[in-house]
Swiss-Prot record:
Gene symbol of the encoding locus: rplW
Function field: One of the early assembly proteins it binds 23S rRNA. One of the proteins that surrounds the polypeptide exit tunnel on the outside of the ribosome. Forms the main docking site for trigger factor binding to the ribosome.
Keyword Zinc applies: no
A GO CC term attached to the entry: ribonucleoprotein complex
UniProt keyword terms in alphabetical order: Ribonucleoprotein, Ribosomal protein, RNA-binding, rRNA-binding
Stated family: Belongs to the universal ribosomal protein uL23 family.
GO molecular function, one term: structural constituent of ribosome
Self-association state and partner proteins as the record states: Part of the 50S ribosomal subunit. Contacts protein L29, and trigger factor when it is bound to the ribosome.
One GO BP: translation
Matches recorded under PANTHER family: 60S RIBOSOMAL PROTEIN L23A (PTHR11620)
Keyword Ribonucleoprotein: yes
UniProt xrefs under InterPro entries: Nucleotide-bd_a/b_plait_sf, Ribosomal_uL23-like, Ribosomal_uL23/eL15/eS24_sf, Ribosomal_uL23_CS
Protein name: Large ribosomal subunit protein uL23
Amino acid sequence: MIGERIYKVLLGPHISEKATIVAEGNGQYVFRVTGDATKPEIKQAIEALFEVKVESVRTLNHKGKTKRTVRGLGKRKDVKKAYVRLAEGQDIDFMVAE
């Protein structure tokens, strides 16, 4: 993968109640990724940026809701999420500041 593409694939971690439960129980982490990202690209990006071993990647496309506004109907953004399972004994700490 081209070095510049690594930084564009991952948009950031997806923090939610479900993501926290999955991280504690199964060693999975949830990331928001670009819509055109593939599973091998996501795996390479996470292994390069966080220096961990990725076991598997599952993705889902979450369609944005249609909402009513003063000017009519509007639509929220579509989001692609990646559920990443790390190898046994590996973890990612998002709170570390170096």
